[in-house]
Amino acid sequence: MATQTKRGRDTRQALIKAGIEEINRYGVANVSVRRIAATCGVSCGAPYKHFGDRREFIAAIIDYVNGQWHVQQAQILAAYAGDTKAQIVEMSTGYVKFLVEHPHLRAILTLKDEEFDNVYHKMRGEVESPTQQLIQRYCEEYAIPPDVRLRKVYVIRALIMGAAIQFENGEMTYGADTLQMVHDSIQRELELP
């Protein structure tokens, strides 16, 4: 019985990973559960055994991607505990690294698709929420007004996504120097009034 359970977990994991590749290749609207099952070498009914329906399957993929980032996020937060500014800067820089080094996951995190409803949008937003919460805490610690906080959230998110896109399309070479530039830009934004 334990072997079947492990095999079931392995199948579920394989389906999720194949689902990520499927979304990268075809987009959410064109996801084929049959194609994913074939990729994994399982029956076309197997995904429904693990996920119920297509929506649950996509939600499981998003949850998996969130989990991958949450592991790294927790390590960063622990390493810089007690220093909100450092947590923001390091987590933001870490997120850029995560997006660049895991392009198959980035596609899920940055996905914009008509088929996504508010639940999927909320699940994807959970990845970025801690950064916004940290910025809010930082602004409260330094009595920074709400309008300035909104600007800081906007600029930091723009720096994160802009850097990831520029690294991906070759406008900037991904490396220690350019990553340090992103790091320093985020830090500078926090220090600006």
PLM features: residue spans?
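Amphipathic alpha-helical packing segments from all-alpha helical-bundle domains
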Residues: 67-70, 74, 116-143, 150-154, ...
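Hydrophobic alpha-helical segments that form the core
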Residues: 146-169, 177-186
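N-terminal intrinsically disordered/low-complexity leader segments
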Residues: 1-10
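Secondary-structure edge/capping motif, primarily at the C-terminal ends of alpha-helices
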Residues: 73-80, 109-116, 167-171
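Hydrophobic alpha-helical connector segments
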Residues: 60, 74-101, 156
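Alpha-helical DNA-contacting segments of helix-turn-helix folds
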Residues: 58-65, 109, 120
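Helix-turn-helix
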Residues: 11-14, 18, 22-56, 60
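Short secondary-structure transition hinges
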Residues: 97-133, 165
